[in-house]
Amino acid sequence: MKLAFSVRMIPLLGFVLGGACQPGAPTGDRPDGVTVLVGTRPTVAEASLFPFDNHSIPFTQNVGLKLHPPRKHPGNPVLPRGPEGAPDEFGVQFYGSVVRHEGKFKLWYVAIGRDPFTVVEEDMMWTPRVDIIPLKWRAAYAESTDGIHWTRPALGLEEYDGSRDNNLVLMEPAPLGVINLKVIHDPEDPDPSRRFKMSLHTWWHEEGKKGLATLAPAVSGDGLRWRLAIPATPENGLLPKESTVIPTDHFEAAGGLYKWGGLFHASGQGARPVYAVDSWGRSVGTYRSPDFVRWEHTGTLSFSREGQHKKVPSGSGEESHEGISVWNRGNVLLGLYGVWHGSPDWRGRTVDLGFVVSNDGVHFREPLTDFIFIRRGEDHEWDQGGLIQGQGFENVGEETYIWYGAWDPGSLEPRGGVGLATLERDRLGSFSVRDDSIPAAFMTAAVEARGEATLWVNAEGVSEDATLRLELYDALERPLAGYSGEGAALLTESGLRVPVSWPEGNGIPGPEKPFKIKVSFEGEKVAGIRVYALYVGT
């Protein structure tokens, strides 16, 4: 049986006009009135409740949160630059995506050919200041059976340097220059020829003159042969200004792409005052579309760092680089963004990767402020200077894979590649006891299951001397008979996915009423327990 359930935020994420409403009360018990539907409550087959998501787990006692950075793979970069004459000989820029589909890991990235810049002027900050040649920056494809060893298939679709023996994907109606792209697979689209979707950071032109960064949406049936989703014909790799789908302000539009609440969201980098509340320097904005063709021109300031509300010279402060790449976990969005460390000189600027989370698909937050989740490499390493957040996240067996890229090294030298970072499955963050001499516990937001539910725990350090007591409460935090007190479940073993057994059975039966989960840390060796996730599903 497939279970559908949703995570409710209690108190409700909304405001009821015209009468009081008890949190968690059935809809039929509510008086007449108006409910403002702020936020989303997606119904999914299995929900993941993480310690760093303080909306899904808002209540704690004597527990501390820790984030766990992944380990870089010793064979990095797992996808290096191509050989001389290849369309990616200058750079493999993983402003791209990895999608697991039909038994393969499929990777899209920006291939940078030789001589991709023109020098505009000598400049103290840029040394020298350059402009991008759009047709030297193209969308390319690689694939793998294990996510570590990659091949570049000869697709024969696009010509480069007089040959079609390359891995460039087809982009119609004409080649389009891209500096950033993201790809998702959308199996819900009734049209099979549109089930792969790509957001492209390109540029518009006006009367042949290159303008500002903008968004171009593209669709494909196989992920290799793409067509623009809008009626537009690029010229010299640029989109006509009249064909733009979002406001023509500079917006680097392909930092992340995801579908949430029935809408497609394009996350990107902006640096101009286009939102009601703005920040200084690079910040994260989001635009939305119901069909991937018509994009709403009202946007959102989705994320900026705490220090960005103080004015500093452009590029010199702490900023948020290139949008948020998103791992859609069904009931919550996890993401990476560029932690920009500014400098008056371009060569002094560096970028690490930070970790964020969202429960509404619009606003993101850092569980720990300015925490560096993946750190740039040391001098002379392949990923020195800075990292870029490709949208590549997968659970593979007992590990979590996160793919990332190397940024501009601060010069006009060849750059890039795709790296892999790994950690134990879903162990991105944990709760542990702060003081083992006093009680420690946490409680989730309300979960509403339609049908019998099962609970699993991802934890380590659990034993007969270090246990987790799990109890269920209703939405008003009254203990549920048979699932609390003497009916509580006691977890005595560690693992990535340990099922919870209640005295009355493994399952949590209906009726379809919201319940909360309380987890208490107990035992002489309680200090060694780490809780990484709860899973509710079938």
Predicted regions and their residues:
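N-terminal secretory signal peptides that target proteins for export/translocation
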Residues: 1-5
